[in-house]
Amino acid sequence: MVWLWLGVGLLGGTGLASLVLAISLFTQRRGRKRSDETSSRGRLPGAASDKRGACACCYRIPKEDVVEPLDLELGLMRVATHPPTPQVPRCTSLYIGEDGLPIDKPEFPPARFEIPDVSTPGTPTSIGRSPSHCSSSSSLSSSASVDTVLHQPPPSWKPPPPPGRKKRPPTPPVRAPTTRLSSHRPPTPIPAPRKNLSTPPTKKTPPPTKPKPVGWTPPVTPRPFPKTPTPQKPPRNPRLPRTVGLENLSKVGLSCPCPRPRTPTEPTTLPIVSVSELAPPPRWSDIEELLEKAVQSVMKDAESMQMT
């Protein structure tokens, strides 16, 4: 331990050194205590010759042998190793007809007792007991007292009714007719309808209505007012005027003049005509002039729209 203490001190851990020292002291003290307990167990007086069932707290140890007070663990171990002797169960059952024992309202028909055989005098008169635990004094009881106990049921007991018959309910009392005069009149009987008589059909009258006031006029149904004329929509933007050159171009591409009217007898094939034969191709100067005119007309339309 000294070398351990020096090694821990050299490491420089003062807290760890104190903890190790405390653990070492605790283990040394506990080892001494266990050695004292094992040495004191053999000094119990009469440990092998005393009676079974005794407790460790019943021993009286001399003062010179007592080193430490008897620990509770020793007593518990003593009780565990030497259990108490089992006690013989006492007889608590009741004898029928035995002198000196009271019989308080025995059950009838008996549930706990059995009817004894009176013909044999040696039969015990109680049930639930073995002859080894109880004395045989009950066999000397007289059979006359047994008969008197069995044949005298308690006054509160009544025999059950036979199963075939049922209890009849009590008849209600008959009331005599009253002779007092009453002011209640019986209802008048409705006459029976006669046969072979046709009753004329009755006309149902409508329920009366309330009289109308003098200046009352029927409500006027509301008439719908004429619809207001919808304002006319503004005119749409006028289309740009088509130029002559563009019209000629479209007509040239779509027109197909025939020299004479077609007859149904002739074939449907048309002669091939070239575009150059019908109209000469346009020049670039003409196209530029047409574009300038179109731009000028568009500008005029835009100025007129802004002015309006």
UniProtKB/Swiss-Prot annotation:
Keywords of the record: Host cell membrane, Host Golgi apparatus, Host membrane, Host-virus interaction, Membrane, Modulation of host NK-cell activity by virus, Signal, Viral immunoevasion
Compositionally biased region (Low complexity): 126-145
Region (Disordered): 105-274
Lineage top rank: taxon: Viruses
GO biological process: symbiont-mediated perturbation of host natural killer cell mediated immune response
Bias-annotated ranges (Pro residues): 152-163, 219-238
Signal peptide positions on this chain: 1-22
GO cellular component labels: host cell Golgi apparatus; host cell plasma membrane; membrane
NADP in keyword set: no
Compartments where found: Host cell membrane; Host Golgi apparatus
Disulfide cross-links: none
Family under the similarity heading: Belongs to the HCMV UL135 family.
Primary role: Remodels the host actin cytoskeleton in order to impair immune recognition of infected cells. Mechanistically, interacts with members of the host WAVE2 complex and redirects the complex to the plasma membrane. In turn, the efficiency of immune synapse formation is greatly reduced.
Subunit and interaction comment: Interacts with host components of the WAVE2 complex ABI1, NAP1 and WAVE2. Also interacts with host ABI2 and TLN1.
Name of the protein in its database record: Protein UL135
Phylogenetic placement of the source organism: Viruses, Duplodnaviria, Heunggongvirae, Peploviricota, Herviviricetes
